[in-house]
Structures are given as structure tokens and as C-alpha cells.
Amino acid sequence: MRIRTCAAFLLLASIDGSAQVPPPADVDPVVARIVASVDEPRVAAIVKSLADFGTRQLYSDTTSATYGIGAAREWIRQQFVAAGPRLQVSFDTYQVAAQGGRLPRDVELRNVVAVLPGKSPRRIYVTGHYDSVARRTDGQGGTTGFDWTRADNDAPGANDDGSGTTVVLEAARVLAASGVDFDATLVFVAFAGEEQGLVGATLHVSRAKQEGWRIDAVLNNDIVGGSHGGAGVSDAGQVRIFSEGPEDSPSRQIARYVRRQAARYQPGHAVTLVARADRFGRGGDHTPFNQQGIAAVRLSEARENYARQHSVDDTPEGVDAAYLTRNVRVNVAALASLALAPSAPRVTDDDGVPRLTRGASGYDAQLAWAPVAGAAGYRVFWRHAWVPDWEHEVTVGSVTEATLPGVSIDDVVVGVAAVGPTGHESLTSVYVMPERKLKEIRTR
């Protein structure tokens, strides 16, 4: 199929390098209904309940019904169960050996998992960590640092990461209660051991690789509830999304997708793309996924308050329930849209070479892709190579090739997404320029 030149194509002449959020497309009333069902009072109540366990440190009490990590994980499990019979709820349990540092002795670690089966086995994750930690206090208003051998001091962890766990629990509730039969399988995970070095997530990813699970996307939420930063700046109008490079990696495609769906279903609440794996020098439970080749992103609040983090002051008073609710809705919009969409198309040949050429004229962008089961059509995206997000798009029919007249593949990046019969689009598959291998030149 050859696409006729239209006004959208002519916009390439005016590219100035600034990122533009794509204009919202048609809103699916089904997804809009699910997003709207996120409940702010319930969000606030979940944060408070998690903080009320006193501490959720990995080595804290496992026998009490009201205090420590044992009580917290059982409560989380019960919340998943209460969300409805469609969810398959379990503990993802590991016996972790003592290895010094943050793991001073043997410990049983339990991630809490709920699975909402879809029509296909491909998985989409939303995650947060439910464990907490706090520096020890000196009794005089100061702190003495971390003591990883002890777990008896308060660590309410309302924002870090009670907020992310709240995203997971509320997303599970509204998506399970929606009655929608999603194409993809949705997985909700509250990880443990994040504060000990991403332990629960690392073990879970290893299991996923061993089991051969296909995981298309991971949305990790860590510190997403505060709108008042430690530097005195407040910002309740945006959330940051961190994604692993390089520029057109699968992780970056997830970030762009979340931003696009947020503009559609949560207008006025910006998703800010941050082109790095995490905050400087930091990491999160998305990190092990990316390290194992599974595309993942991290969502975090716009303005952090470092004084509250890992302290007895990380209480519900530092969480803005209205702001956190909007961040839950951003997650739900992306999860529902992606789970209703087909798989992303394959844009390389059997040798891994991108199916993108200059066409017969030598000056057009000619692209091809493999057909996707369940796709009703495809959407082609392109942008100037220096710009972080898609600037132009055109929807094509049920075809497997297209030509963009006058579009130079030297100057733009091109991608294609599959569109389902209800209009939901997949992640975008990008035509990435192959790496040139260093050639060894022999001399005499």
C-alpha cells in the first residue's frame, strides 16, 4: 500500500526538536469507565493500612497479626482475594540465604502475586514493593544510619513504597471488577526485599525466565504518592517515567505508550519522559527485568522529599491521596489499553535486519512488517531522530507494508503498532538502525 501525501507529512518541514504530546484519540468508554472507578478514599485507606503495620522490613515480625512484614503480606494477599474470584492469588516464596551486608541471616521472602488470566499467555505487569526500611533514631531527633541486623524500629513506608503497593492493589481491584475479558494476562505483584537490594524482583525474574513466561511490559511504581518536594517545591500535575536506553529500546516504547494513554484518559496530568533507567545512582524493581531483557519502566513522583524516605517520618501525612489517585489512573489506563490491544508487530526479517528501505525512488520511507493475529489495521509513527516522542502518525488498513512519500529514513525514526478491532493499539515496534561492527584491517 502507498499512502498519499497529506498535511501530516508536510509537517516534517517544520520540526524544531521540541517534544509534542500526541493529541488524544478517541476514548474507549470501557477503559474510561475502569479508570474512573479508581477510588480516592480507598487509595488513602490502603496507604494508611500499610503504614499501620509499623514496619514492613524484610526481617521484621512474621508471627503477629498486626505488626511487621508477616501481617502486611497476609493483609495484601487478602486484599487481592477480596478483589474477586477472577484473580489467581498466591505467595511467590523463596528461601534466601544469609550473605552479609543487607542480608545478614537466612530469611523467607514472599512476594504477593495476583494474576488476571487473559485470552493469551502474554503478560503485562504492574508492580511495587511492600517492604520498608528506616534509619535508626538516636533518641534525640537524629539518626544513626541503617542497622541491617535489626528490624525493630518503626519504618511506616507510606510513600516508599506503600504508594506503589497501593497502585498495585487498586489497579487489581478495578481491572478484575471490570468484567472485561482482556487479551493479555495481567499480573499484579507486591515485591519484598527491594530495600535489601531488589531481592524479590530479581528472584521472580529468574523464575520467569526459567518458566519461559512471555512478559511484554512491566510498570513499576516506586514513590508515587508525594506532591510536596523536599526543596519546598510542590508539583501535583505530573509523574515521571524512567526508561532504559538506548533511545528506541522496548523500555522507551513502554514509556511513550504510558504517556500517550495518560493524555487520552487522564488529561491534565502529565507523564514526563526521563531518558535514564532510574534516578541518578538509584535502582528499583524494574531494574532486574531490564537486566534480563524484559522491558520495564519506573514511575515516580515529580518532586521527591529525601528527608522522609527511609525514615520514621514516611507517614501517610506525606502522601497526597488525590495525586496518588491520578497516578493509579495513569497506570490503569495504560494497563487496560495495552491488555486489550494485539501484540506488537515484528519489523525485522529472519536475520534480524529491519524491513525499512528508501523505496524505488531512493527518497521515500518504505516499511514492511509481519502480520499480527487479531489486528484490524496498523498505525505508523515517525519523528525527527533528535526528538524523544512521536510527532506524526497515520493509520493504515489491514496491510503489511506502507510508504511515506518524501520522508527520509536518514532523518526520522519510524515505527509501527498493531491496532485491534476496538481501536486499541499495541506497543510500537521501531525500525532500529543495525549496529555497524568494527572491522579489523590487516596490515603487512
Across the structure, where does each feature detected by a protein language model lie?
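Active-site-adjacent mobile loop/cap segments within catalytic or ligand-binding domains
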Residues: 49-51, 224-240, 274-343
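Conserved aromatic anchor
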Residues: 363-374
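Metal-dependent peptidase/peptidase-like ectodomains
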Residues: 191-288, 292-296
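A non-catalytic alpha/beta surface segment that caps or lines the substrate-entry region
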Residues: 42-117, 270-272
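Alpha-helical metal-binding/catalytic segments enriched in His/Glu/Asp
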Residues: 114, 126, 131-132, 137-197, ...
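Extracellular fibronectin type III
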Residues: 421-444
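N-terminal capping segment at the start of a domain
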Residues: 21-67, 307-312
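Beta-strand-rich modules
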Residues: 404-425
